[in-house]
Amino acid sequence: MSLQHEKVTIAPLVLLSALDHYERTQTKENKRCVGVILGDANSSTIRVTNSFALPFEEDEKNSDVWFLDHNYIENMNEMCKKINAKEKLIGWYHSGPKLRASDLKINELFKKYTQNNPLLLIVDVKQQGVGLPTDAYVAIEQVKDDGTSTEKTFLHLPCTIEAEEAEEIGVEHLLRDVRDQAAGGLSIRLTNQLKSLKGLQSKLKDVVEYLDKVINKELPINHTILGKLQDVFNLLPNLGTPDDDEIDVENHDRINISNNLQKALTVKTNDELMVIYISNLVRSIIAFDDLIENKIQNKKIQEQRVKDKQSKVSDDSESESGDKEATAPLIQRKNKKN
């Protein structure tokens, strides 16, 4: 691979197109759907901006048996060039949810259509958990530690979702339709926090399972992955206190510095949490005071309405009695004449 790619950005249109493709071709066997992705792969960041579906068939029992229409790929690619010449064929996608045995062979086929190493994008159309429903891979030659011949394997690339302004507006409208309008801001934040914690728990579980398989020699040692995990662990703050038997004279100064850093981090965290607590408390008191004021105002308005209604009734009764008194002498005169 002449160009070293670092990450992949995916437009929401690609996810919607892949989901629509799967829904239209869904069968009882729940076979995966395959398509082509378009975009730009001439920098360290691969940008996936568009896609189109492909006719695809495969034998579930035999991974070597599959069908892909080459003429359809070429014709659709030429049509897409006429619409947007900047979008190049950079790889392919399928509905996963995991890698298949035939993916390497299909990936080799797409090399004839791409300028660089083709990108494989897996879109999980039935994702139940939290996190992005996408995984991106590029094929590389893996060098083994035992000195044997290299073999082709997939390298995972981090993914993010990025949208243009028009796409952001469309996504906001979609979210507005599916969002529960009755839910308050606090409940939405708590729900998002819960989903984030569940996602973190799932990722940590995957890390533990991977390390267990490496220890049990079910998977080969990958120094790149272990180095990434070590970098993650190094970013975590060390808030633990050393045991008494771990303290000696040589590293006593270093432990004191570590303890000071731990204390400073703890104090700063507690101060920030205290500010958040006081702010929420003040906000709640103000809201409660506004509620009381609204209750008082509503009661005054209700009392005023009752007084107005009573005064109106009394005025009507007085006017009726005045009319009766004015008409009484006339009635008496008529009676005398008769």
From Swiss-Prot:
GO terms for biological process: proteasome-mediated ubiquitin-dependent protein catabolic process; ubiquitin-dependent protein catabolic process. The modification N-acetylserine is found at residue 2. The modification Phosphothreonine is found at residue 327. Keywords: Acetylation, Phosphoprotein, Proteasome. Residues 8-143 form the MPN domain. CDD domains: MPN_RPN7_8. One of its GO terms (cellular component) is proteasome regulatory particle, lid subcomplex. Belongs to the peptidase M67A family. Present with 19800 molecules/cell in log phase SD medium. This is 26S proteasome regulatory subunit RPN8.
